[in-house]
């Protein structure tokens, strides 16, 4: 029998009154073997919506593509952008339909719509939980401890971004299968924008 192999990744999301921050580290690992330090785990769906994920890169990319195509189709047909909950529900249905051969990915759906900012946490079977902040993946316990200690509902989006980076750095330092730099997406009323935080590599 083959030995069990952990798929490493850590992603976090933080919601504020101004918007949402999604962030993930960039290392792609298989067990304790690093395949790449430039893996993309944060994806912009449109200028109001993005996802961050932990799991297998191929499954993350597939889910992101499904969401992008359906968001665009909805916008073309309805002449308006879909709500965050509508897109999360669609993704939930897709993931649940594969429950006997599930996607190996946990997903954070973040965005802003007419009802305000939203952060939705999804497990590989598509369960939906809306929360103010969350962490997924192998470094989740380390990251969530940092966010728990510093999160404030009235914090600024800039402070939320700093907290997300701080949480991921904590995970990167102690989780052997997380690492590389950090990709972020910041979503507010002005749109969604990507940023990258490069980290010093310690050997």
Swiss-Prot record:
Catalytic activity: Cleavage of peptide bonds with very broad specificity
Entry-linked PROSITE patterns: PROTEASOME_BETA_2
GO terms for MF: threonine-type endopeptidase activity
Subcellular location field: Cytoplasm
Pfam assignment, any one: Proteasome
GO BP terms, alphabetized: proteasomal protein catabolic process
Propeptide: 1-9
Active site per database record: 10
Notes on activation and inhibition: The formation of the proteasomal ATPase PAN-20S proteasome complex, via the docking of the C-termini of PAN into the intersubunit pockets in the alpha-rings, triggers opening of the gate for substrate entry. Interconversion between the open-gate and close-gate conformations leads to a dynamic regulation of the 20S proteasome proteolysis activity.
GO cellular component terms, A-Z: cytoplasm; proteasome core complex, beta-subunit complex
Keywords carried by this UniProt record: Autocatalytic cleavage, Cytoplasm, Hydrolase, Protease, Proteasome, Threonine protease, Zymogen
Its EC number(s): 3.4.25.1
Assigned protein family: Belongs to the peptidase T1B family.
Complexes and interactors: The 20S proteasome core is composed of 14 alpha and 14 beta subunits that assemble into four stacked heptameric rings, resulting in a barrel-shaped structure. The two inner rings, each composed of seven catalytic beta subunits, are sandwiched by two outer rings, each composed of seven alpha subunits. The catalytic chamber with the active sites is on the inside of the barrel. Has a gated structure, the ends of the cylinder being occluded by the N-termini of the alpha-subunits. Is capped at one or both ends by the proteasome regulatory ATPase, PAN.
NCBIfam families associated with the record: arc_protsome_B
Stored PANTHER family: ATP-DEPENDENT PROTEASE SUBUNIT HSLV, METALLOPROTEASE TLDD
Function, in words: Component of the proteasome core, a large protease complex with broad specificity involved in protein degradation.
Protein name, as recorded: Proteasome subunit beta 2
Provenance organism: Pyrobaculum calidifontis (strain DSM 21063 / JCM 11548 / VA1)
The organism's taxonomic lineage, starting at the top: Archaea, Thermoproteota, Thermoprotei, Thermoproteales, Thermoproteaceae
UniProt gene name: psmB2
